[in-house]
Regions:
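Short coil/turn segments at secondary-structure junctions
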Residues: 7-10, 39, 88, 154
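Short pre-active-site segment immediately N-terminal to the catalytic Zn-binding motif
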Residues: 2-20
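Catalytic or ion-translocation cores adjacent to nucleophile or general acid/base/metal-coordination motifs
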Residues: 2-4, 30-69
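Short, hydrophobic/aliphatic alpha-helical segments
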Residues: 6, 33-34, 145, 206
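C-terminal, non-catalytic "cap/extension" segments appended to globular domains
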Residues: 16-20, 27-28, 46, 54-58, ...
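Catalytic zinc-binding patch centered on the HExxH motif and its immediate surroundings
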Residues: 1-2, 153
Length: 251
């Protein structure tokens, strides 16, 4: 059965990846639609966002070439580093920001951050985790956290942070199911029935089990960890270590 998604889009890579991401949500819905309503949700808040992003991890240059959407990329270290740098700007740069949002919210809820210091505390966290500072002087007359929709909407943000961790765990497990033997960043599970069946076995559980049990069905582990991210970005890590040798990095 086909599904439909209505959106305003342009014929570019960003919108193509958005389609894959949104279809990840849709097929998650379809797999758990026969469960009791109480269980028709992701195993935890991070799962739903991670599903679509896991699919996107398989949209590799080789996969796009197979579809005839891009020309063949001549294998080279430069090409790998360029692609990894692009992915890191999306996947790694987000992580500290994803942590800042809810850490600030939780400290507001606990009273550790008081109304008189909302903005000061916001920028202290931004500087601590992201190494960024306001471009112009800010005071408590400003409310910069409110510029992020999820803050005034009181929408938890940890789901996105967690999704950026577990999507790489999912991808690694699916690549193993598909029998892929190369570097993790080159793996595309498209066309693998074995990977699809392994994925579906987890998706159809919805929220019917503790999330640890659901994760174990796919990954074989009951914990969230960043080992798969480190493996995925190993080429970039090695390159950055070379480029920054003898330098002190940080803020």
């Amino acid at each position: 059965n086909g599904v439909r998604s209505r959106m305003c889009m342009q014929p570019n890579e960003e919108d193509l990846c958005t389609i894959y991401h949104e279809l990840g949500h849709v097929y998650y819905y379809l797999w758990y639609k026969d469960l009791p309503p109480l269980f028709q949700n992701g195993a935890h808040d991070g799962f739903h966002e991670a599903i679509g992003d896991t699919v996107n991890l398989s949209v590799t240059p080789q996969y796009l070439h197979g579809l005839g959407l891009v020309s063949a990329v001549k294998p080279s270290r430069e090409a790998v580093i360029n692609q990894q740098m692009k992915m890191a700007s999306e996947k790694i740069a987000f992580l500290p920001f994803g942590k800042v949002i809810d850490e600030w919210r939780w400290k507001v809820f606990s009273g550790e951050i008081t109304p008189a210091h909302y903005n000061e505390a916001w920028w202290k966290l931004r500087t601590q985790y992201q190494g960024v500072a306001p471009p112009v002087p800010r005071t408590e007359a400003d409310f910069d956290p409110g510029s992020k929709y999820h803050v005034p909407a009181n929408t938890p943000y940890t789901r996105y942070f967690l999704s950026f961790i577990i999507q790489f765990q999912f991808q690694k497990a699916l690549c193993e199911a598909a029998g892929f033997k190369g570097p993790l960043h080159e793996c595309s599970i498209f066309g693998s029935k074995a990977a699809g069946e392994r994925f579906a076995a987890m998706l159809k559980l919805g929220q019917s089990e503790p999330w640890q049990d659901t994760m174990e069905k796919l990954t074989g582990t009951r914990q969230m960890d960043a080992a798969a991210i480190l493996e995925y970005f190993q080429p970039l890590q090695a390159w950055l270590a070379e480029q920054s040798k003898g330098q002190t990095c940080g803020w």
